[in-house]
């Protein structure tokens, strides 16, 4: 027993050293503390209830919200009630909504047992289903998908509660004449991934989702084009800069995982070069740019041996690009110039760009954690970086955890960027509903510009706490201004929080295991001190 305990002590010391290394010099100087990942998990799932559009259910826990968008799609003769508002406004953008659901589903696929152990399985499934129920409505024909409800220009002119909306609820679709392979591909990915999640608890629903996913993928692949070329109104808000080829690969990989059918993997292998899957060396992962996610999913098939021998060579190329992303986050790519590695703030935060940088942090944390787990399944699991350096699974996992801890308050400002968590967090989130008196408390109509006049410019905290939201976060120097007008830093988005559902669940399990190990190790330290 004593020998086992001493080994555990050594393992804990090694883990602490890896965490210090992963956080960088600035983060090492920041005081580290234990975080309540279970509390963070519970709060993160509450956020999705605050973002609901449509008729709210009786078990709605975010009491300051009420029904909204109840006539969405009416002018077009289609029922588009439901879904999620993406951020602090009231447009329903299909591409980021679908990516949110994909990442929620991936969280559950990898760490669903951990979510269930924390007692949050039901809430997580509800969060996914609120999105997929909407996608079923929006996919009205095999080759037709409603991709947006509302207009960003008129919406941003007003500052209203969603319950008071007077802005346009025009709906926009993609179809054979106006293709949108990116939004259709991402929605296919979301529904395929969600079908895996619901396979045990609701097999009929899982089959329905898979049916829609397969139809949407066929539509996206057969009628190719960027959705922002078909829907001009989306260009100023969610332009598809990366194009649609990454979404086609992404959707095919999720359909392969959901069905096990070889032709989906053949598609990923056959189009690896021409679609950029084995060509693009990427250092970001987001609602727009899916290549790193594609490469990591493809590498998983290689690491776990879930492929035919004829696929090996191409999957090895995918793995090389996946490890470029991982090494870029670690700062280990010796070749490729300044853009080959992700910048770090003095406090250790991965920094990609000024506007809503936290989306890149949270998505990176998830990809790193998942890849570390995939590496752990391989006897020779290690990351090979450009220039000859290597990194083990433990180091990759430690960086993922360091990014999560930064979000939760282990940073130079000591602020949690997860709203409602800890003693210090943003109080003036750029969010219309949260910043105005709740509709249930005051049903007096608030007009389009009244919100700007009476609520937007207030220096006081928001009357409603947007629990579980992850705001845009600090700049490259770890600086942050908690001001409603500072939308680049204080606006939260659903796709910021979605990957953290899985991360909080995983880290909650790890923290529990560490406490158990510490309890075993403590007597051994005492015994060693007496020798």
Swiss-Prot record:
Annotated signal sequence range: 1-27
EC number: 3.2.1.4
Catalytic activity: Endohydrolysis of (1->4)-beta-D-glucosidic linkages in cellulose, lichenin and cereal beta-D-glucans
Tissue expression summary: Ubiquitous.
Alphabetical list of InterPro entries matching this protein: 6-hairpin_glycosidase_sf, 6hp_glycosidase-like_sf, Glyco_hydro_9, Glyco_hydro_9_His_AS
Similarity section: Belongs to the glycosyl hydrolase 9 (cellulase E) family.
Name the record gives this protein: Endoglucanase 7
Organism the protein comes from: Oryza sativa subsp. japonica (Rice)
Taxon lineage: Eukaryota, Viridiplantae, Streptophyta, Embryophyta, Tracheophyta
Gene label: GLU10
